[in-house]
Amino acid sequence: MPEINASNLDEKQVQLLAEMCILIDENDNKIGADTKKNCHLNENIDKGLIHRAFSVFLFNTENKLLLQQRSDAKITFPGCFTNSCCSHPLNNPGELEENDAMGVKRAAQRRLKAELGIPLEEVDLNEMNYLTRIYYKAQSDGIWGEHEIDYILFLRKNVTLNPDPNEIKSYCYVSKEELKEILKKEARGEIKLTPWFKIIADAFLFKWWDNLNHLSPFVDHEKIHRM
């Protein structure tokens, strides 16, 4: 395995590697906890380590989707464009609650504040729509990767943004047509997308986006989409 040289990594992002993520099996049953670092090392992923995660898709009242470009300081997928917010619930009582994915929603509220500066009071947990779950695995480089079951959360409202530059390099709201152009740029190798965002955009996103006012037919809390 390639050596990890922490001196090459951002200090703040290294501190976050100590956070305790939720270990799960392939059916999203909690089986333990481990550090964010251990969860994202390819050597552990290759042994089957899986953790719980979430992806927020935040739309404004014009039905435009907030995209972010991950900062160059990020340890996994730096500089990649992705959906509004992507992270992990932590192994604590508030974020472990599984009823209506309330634990994941609390984690999303926390990270929307940490990454995008959205005030907590602007993110009502009851306004988040938990649609479904996606299981995937992807390498970032020779050392780091992802292996997770990703809870898909939709939220539509206008919010106050004050992004943390250590987390986010840039951001923008896009229409469906603008996102299609971004996907074409990615296909030409002009920009990079995170693997989970590309999976979701290719397989599900536009269908969901077309039905923002009627998402209930797409809610499936039983199935885990294995991509």
Curated annotation (Swiss-Prot):
It is found in: Peroxisome. The active site is at C86, E148. Keywords: Acetylation, Cholesterol biosynthesis, Cholesterol metabolism, Isomerase, Isoprene biosynthesis, Lipid biosynthesis, Lipid metabolism, Magnesium, Metal-binding, Peroxisome, Steroid biosynthesis, Steroid metabolism, Sterol biosynthesis, Sterol metabolism. One of its GO terms (molecular function) is metal ion binding. GO terms for cellular component: cytoplasm; peroxisome. Pathway: Isoprenoid biosynthesis; dimethylallyl diphosphate biosynthesis; dimethylallyl diphosphate from isopentenyl diphosphate: step 1/1. It comes from the Eukaryota. The keyword Disulfide bond does not apply. Mg(2+) binds at H40, H51, E146, E148. This is Isopentenyl-diphosphate Delta-isomerase 1. It comes from Rattus norvegicus (Rat). The lineage of its organism: Eukaryota, Metazoa, Chordata, Craniata, Vertebrata.
